[in-house]
Amino acid sequence: MANPRNEAALAELKARFAETDTVVLTEYRGLTVAQTTELRKALGFDVQYSVAKNTLVKIAANEAGIEGLDDLLTGPTAVAFIKGEAVDTAKVLKKFGEENKAFVVKGGYMDGNALTAEQVNAIAELDNRETTLAKLAGAMKGSLAKAAGLFNAPASQVARLAVALQDKKDA
């Protein structure tokens, strides 16, 4: 690999793998430049979506300690390097795949595990972090209100009992 362009591309891929939380591999065969540009815009700034030679991606991934991608690196492959919320990116990729039949999610890598295409699509069905935290906060708030009601119930029952006893004495 004495080609300087390959060496530069490999160095860039290594850097991306090093600073990335999640990687998704896709097949882009049949997409136009306009469609690819549309996808890049939809993915946003936290995702770098680029086409690279499969051999360079294999080498960079292996040197970064990422295993399990070799079988996915066949045919024309583009890599989505995700720095932020993987769920949001998976949702964008899934929606784009539904709208553009030529686009295929091959699989990926997240939290030390290789992912199949089905697993990436399953991630797209999850709620993102903010929504999950909001649901959790709502559930906790409801539980705390119930607990406060339970703690206040004995005190109000004692007060009602005292009033009833007083009324009985007066009668």
Swiss-Prot record:
Any one Gene Ontology BP term: translation
Claim: Iron is one of the keywords in the record: no
Keyword terms of this UniProt record: Ribonucleoprotein, Ribosomal protein, RNA-binding, rRNA-binding
Gene Ontology CC terms, in alphabetical order: ribonucleoprotein complex; ribosome
Molecular function via GO: large ribosomal subunit rRNA binding
Function: Forms part of the ribosomal stalk, playing a central role in the interaction of the ribosome with GTP-bound translation factors.
Protein name as it appears in the record: Large ribosomal subunit protein uL10
